[in-house]
Each structure stands twice: as C-alpha cells, then as structure tokens.
Amino acid sequence: MEYTGSKYIGEYVDGRMEGKAKYILPTETIYVGEMKDGMFHGEGTLYFPSGSQYDAIWENGLAIKGTYTFSDGLHYDEKNWHYCDGYDRRFYTEILNGLKPAGMAQLTNMDPPRKIPKGYYDCGDGFYNPVTRVVKDYRNRFLRNADDDEHEWITRTCRKG
C-alpha cells in the first residue's frame, strides 16, 4: 500500500483483502464496502473529495449497477437525464430555489461562481489546464488526466478564465 499511496483498513482472507473494508486512494477518494480477492466486490460506495458519491454493486472490481449523487444532492439518471439539457437549462440550485430576477443571470450551479485562473476551464469538479491536460480539484489537488474526448468537451463547453 505504501508504494501506491493507498491505505487499507479491513479484513483479510489468506493474506488477501477480503470482506468489509475501507480503502483510501491517493486522490483521497474513499471506498467503503465489500472486497473479494483484493477487488471491490459486492455492495460498496466511492466517496469523492468533492462531496459526491457513487453507490454500486461491484463484481470483481467492476461496477455492474450504480447511482451517482453530486455533492449538492442531484442524482444522475442515465436513462432520463433532464438536468441542464436542451429543454431545461436551469441549474440544480435554480430548480431547488427558483430563478433569479431578470438581469441577475446565474452562470454556474454555484452562485456566485468560482474565480477561474487565467487560461484554465472550470469543468465542474475542478479546474482544467488545457496545456498539461490535467484536472485539479478546487483545492489544487490532482484529480485526473483528461483524454482527447474530455479535452474537446471541456474546451467546447466549460467556462474559461
């Protein structure tokens, strides 16, 4: 574990991570749930540093069924996703709290919006640097490297500083 920067607190069977566990990844994402042969297996939840979470049924390390909940309580629905689509452009906070008066536009779900560093994009869970193709959370901690599809989506869709 010390080699990867991860931490495991849980049961072992024959020297392998198995049973109920808490697994802390180097990104500070935390898995709480069942393990089998060193993999997520059974019911378990990933808790992300942003405050969002993914509850799933896992099979040999792969999520076979799950639900994602954003930090503001919005649930992602793969089949009937109508949040901020072509028909209803309201942010979740506007759905919960109503629209602002005319002339007081809301630019992001967070109001007032975060200040974006020059040349970066706000991609919802952090700031994206298009030169390094790295997304860091709002506390400047590494989240991920963006692939070509995510890079294209962010630069086409997200607010730029």
Curated annotation (Swiss-Prot):
Tell me the compartments it is located in. Cell projection, Cilium, Flagellum
| Entries under Pfam families matching the protein | MORN
Q: Which Gene Ontology CC terms are recorded? A: sperm flagellum
MORN repeat start and end residues: 8-30, 31-53, 54-75
The domain of life is Eukaryota
Do you know which SUPFAM superfamilies this protein is assigned to?
Answer: Histone H3 K4-specific methyltransferase SET7/9 N-terminal domain
Distribution of this protein across tissues and organs: Expressed in sperm (at protein level).
Keywords, A to Z, come to:
Cell projection, Cilium, Flagellum, Repeat
InterPro entries hit by this protein: MORN (IPR003409), Morn5 (IPR042814)
The protein, known as: MORN repeat-containing protein 5
Name the species this protein comes from. Answer: Homo sapiens
Q: What gene is behind this protein?
A: MORN5
